[in-house]
C-alpha cells in the first residue's frame, strides 16, 4: 500500500458510515495526513475487510487478526460526528502508525 488507508466498517447505519468517512478524511487532511478513507458495509458484503492500515468499526465485525491491522471501535460517531474522545483516539493511532 502506497497511501495510508483507513476503512470505516459499518452495517445497517446507512448514510452515517459515509458521513463518518468524509468527516475523518477532512479531519486527517487538516492534520496533515494524506489518507485514503473508504467504507466497507458488512450488511451488503460480509467478506474479509479490504487491506488497510487502520480499520474503524461502527459495529463489532472484525478482530485485528482478521483485519491484519489495528482496529478501533468508533461507535460514538454514529450519534456524534464530533465525539472528541473518539476523534482523539483515531488521530493518535494515525500519528503512531503513519509512515515517516
Predicted regions and their residues:
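Short, charged N-terminal beta->alpha structural module
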Residues: 3-36
Amino acid at each position: 500500500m502506497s497511501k495510508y488507508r483507513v476503512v470505516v466498517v459499518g452495517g445497517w447505519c446507512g448514510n452515517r458510515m459515509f458521513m463518518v468517512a468524509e468527516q475523518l478524511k477532512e479531519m486527517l487532511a487538516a492534520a496533515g495526513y494524506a489518507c485514503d478513507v473508504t467504507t466497507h458495509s458488512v450488511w451488503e458484503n460480509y467478506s474479509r475487510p479490504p487491506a488497510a492500515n487502520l480499520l474503524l468499526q461502527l459495529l463489532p465485525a472484525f478482530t485485528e487478526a482478521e483485519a491484519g491491522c489495528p482496529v478501533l471501535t468508533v461507535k460514538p460517531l454514529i450519534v456524534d460526528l464530533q465525539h472528541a474522545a473518539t476523534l482523539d483516539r483515531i488521530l493518535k493511532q494515525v500519528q503512531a502508525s503513519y509512515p515517516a
